[in-house]
């Protein structure tokens, strides 16, 4: 009986240790005061990538561009860069959550969004939000799972 418990505990410890070693943290280069932000752009655990919330900021001003369409493009480019930095593609994205300060921008966002996928789209939510960081209109986060070769 004690041997079974000991073996069970040993297997549990080994599986936890193996899982911890299987993480890759994705942090894209950041400028200015963005360098010290306390989060990763994505975390790859096994074949699953957890994509942190991305906002679309102009690299020169650190603020969202005047155009909602341009901001949507910057957000989606940030998502794409994180996904590709982990060795995955946008076709591996299985779930997306979009937070938006103006639900009237639904069609504007969709016009940009759909250009990033080929074929089937990820599961998705488009959620209204009162305010977002740095005055952004959109924040996007998601999950990608690497397909078997």
Where are the language model's segments positioned?
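N-terminal secretory signal peptides that target proteins for export/translocation
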Residues: 1-2
């Amino acid at each position: 009986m004690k041997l079974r418990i000991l073996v069970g505990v040993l297997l549990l410890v080994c599986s936890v240790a193996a899982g911890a070693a299987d993480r890759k943290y994705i942090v894209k280069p950041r400028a200015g005061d963005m360098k010290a932000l306390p989060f990763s752009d994505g975390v790859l655990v096994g074949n699953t990538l957890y994509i942190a919330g991305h906002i679309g900021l102009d690299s020169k001003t650190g603020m969202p561009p005047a155009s909602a369409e341009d901001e949507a493009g910057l957000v989606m480019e940030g998502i794409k860069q994180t996904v590709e930095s982990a060795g995955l593609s946008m076709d591996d994205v299985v779930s997306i959550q979009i937070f938006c300060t103006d639900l009237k921008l639904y069609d504007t966002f969709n016009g940009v969004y759909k250009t990033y996928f080929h074929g089937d789209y990820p599961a998705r939510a488009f959620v209204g939000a009162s305010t977002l960081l740095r005055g952004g209109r959109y924040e996007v986060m998601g999950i990608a799972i690497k397909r078997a070769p």
